[in-house]
Amino acid sequence: QVTVEADYGFGGEAREGRYLPIEVSYSNEKGSAFTGTLRILTLESNMEVYQYEYPVELKPGEKKTEEYYVPLGVENDQIFLSLLDWEENEVVRKRLKLDISSESAVMFVGALSDDPDSLDYLDDAGFNYGTLRTRLVPLTAEKIPENELGLDQFDMVVVDDFDWNTLTQEQ
């Protein structure tokens, strides 16, 4: 049996009109290898369903996590994931109900620091006479993606008192 768990965004929030990182954890509990496809379905702003497919290969007993990036249309509050075997039989189906920020005047700020509490003052800060507020999302070296699309949910990333040597070359 192959199992799939999925999570999205940073801190369980998503912003429409941007690329959304989706982290998918696979576990192959079968005694044989698994070869198939992960299919991700999203509803785009033009109300058309878009389909993204990614190959999946798992050795017997293997567990692994992959990150995918899909564009998130406006007014889309869910994403469907299906794991298909090599014969295109559906093995697992998941629905991700997205927590879309309903506040259009919110600036998402990623905070990369060895002392994240030192940047708390940036959370819920008001700009332009309070018409624009910030939402601070603490980041760690492990959560910085290797693909720049993984940071598309942020309006800015603030770095303070951080050891750059903890990042990989790809990051």
Summary of predicted features, one role per range:
Residues 21-29, 69:
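Short edge beta-strand/loop segments characteristic of extracellular beta-sandwich folds
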Residues 76-156, 160-163:
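Aromatic-Pro/Gly-enriched surface loop or interdomain linker
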Residues 11-13, 27-32:
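Short solvent-exposed strand-capping/beta-turn motif centered on an Asx-Ser/Thr pair
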Residues 166-171:
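A short, gly/pro- and small-residue-rich
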Residues 46-54, 65, 90-94:
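Surface-exposed loop/edge segments in extracytoplasmic proteins
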Residues 1-21:
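Non-catalytic, glycine-rich low-complexity segments
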Residues 54-62, 66-76, 80:
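Short, hydrophobic beta-strand segments
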Residues 31-47:
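Short acidic, flexible loop segments centered on an aromatic residue
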